[in-house]
């Protein structure tokens, strides 16, 4: 009886040994299959090395975090770390017609040397006033862009806009601006090209509404189609002093900055990222009555001013003097 028990015991132990061996082989096979599948996947974004300081989107300043506005345009992309380019990825090419780096200290530099001043005799499109070159002036603090009441029923307002003669592509765009305050006003810093120039409508924007200058708006367009725009609260009132605003437009992503802090970015490889070099624009305007639901009824007195004291462009992959340097120098002084 005892001998039989020992035989059964050996038999059961042998079975468990076989089961353990089979289980181990199964686990090893699954592990090897997972590795093979990962490396054979066409989408290798999850395998790339994350940058030393990963950026998550939307991005908020560490101290006073801007929350997305309660407005209808709360379309921030889901949070995702920004991957670094793969080592074997070819360097992205600059867009055709893109010009070299520049920096303009507006107020000191003669604006007309680099910028075209928009001009019209009457309101057109969705703009509620005539473009008036005389509403752009150089001052000790920078170049002012004024919106004025005209007292004319047909032309109730005069508005201001300047755009570069040259076109610019991938790189970092910066401006130091103090925004005009008052319901009905729109201040904008953006790149644009479109059918007027024989191009698709491509655009990257930073916009402010004078009715609430504690908010900032980010937009982008490709071939007339709008990407995922967003509105953020600022930790300051943009009408009370100059601040540094910027966006970095790259082939696979656009990132927007306020005072050097990243606030928002498009999704990686978003199909709405522009692909055509455009002109740099600054504008200050009020719209036709249909636009008042967005920017408010004009109620800013007889004149309101947006001031731009610096504008710069640094091409992708280059390191040039920019408005960031000017802003730091002014703060330090």
Predicted regions and their residues:
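GH16 jelly-roll
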Residues: 11, 15, 19-26, 33-62, ...
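N-terminal Lys/Arg-rich, disordered targeting/topogenic segments
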Residues: 1-14
């Amino acid at each position: 009886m005892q001998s039989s028990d020992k035989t059964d015991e050996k038999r059961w132990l042998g079975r468990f040994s076989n089961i353990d061996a089979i289980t181990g082989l199964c686990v090893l096979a699954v592990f090897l299959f997972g590795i093979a599948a990962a490396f054979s996947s066409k989408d290798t974004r999850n395998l790339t090395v994350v940058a030393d300081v990963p950026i998550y989107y939307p991005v908020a300043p560490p101290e006073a975090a801007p929350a997305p506005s309660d407005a209808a345009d709360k379309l921030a992309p889901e949070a995702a770390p920004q991957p670094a380019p793969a080592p074997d990825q070819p360097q992205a090419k600059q867009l055709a017609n893109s010009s070299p780096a520049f920096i303009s200290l507006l107020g000191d530099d003669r604006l007309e040397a680099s910028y075209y001043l928009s001009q019209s005799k009457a309101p057109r499109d969705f703009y509620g006033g005539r473009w008036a070159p005389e509403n752009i002036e150089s001052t000790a603090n920078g170049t002012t862009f004024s919106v004025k009441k005209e007292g004319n029923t047909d032309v109730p307002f005069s508005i201001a806009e300047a755009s570069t003669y040259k076109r610019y592509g991938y790189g970092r765009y910066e401006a130091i601006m103090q925004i005009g305050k008052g319901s009905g006003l729109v201040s904008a810093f953006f790149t644009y090209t479109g059918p007027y120039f024989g191009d698709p409508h491509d655009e990257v924007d930073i916009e402010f509404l004078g009715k609430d200058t504690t908010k900032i708006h980010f937009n982008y367009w490709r071939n007339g189609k709008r990407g995922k725009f967003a509105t953020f609260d600022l930790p300051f009132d943009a009408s009370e002093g100059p601040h540094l605003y910027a966006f970095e437009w790259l082939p696979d992503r656009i990132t927007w900055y306020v005072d050097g802090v990243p606030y928002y970015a498009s999704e990686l490889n978003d199909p709405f990222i522009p692909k055509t070099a455009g002109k740099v624009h600054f504008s200050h305007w009020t719209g036709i009555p249909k636009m008042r639901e967005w920017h408010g009824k004009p109620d800013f007195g007889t004149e309101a001013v947006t001031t731009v004291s610096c504008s710069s462009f640094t091409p992708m992959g280059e390191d040039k003097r920019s408005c960031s340097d000017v802003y730091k120098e002014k703060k330090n002084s």
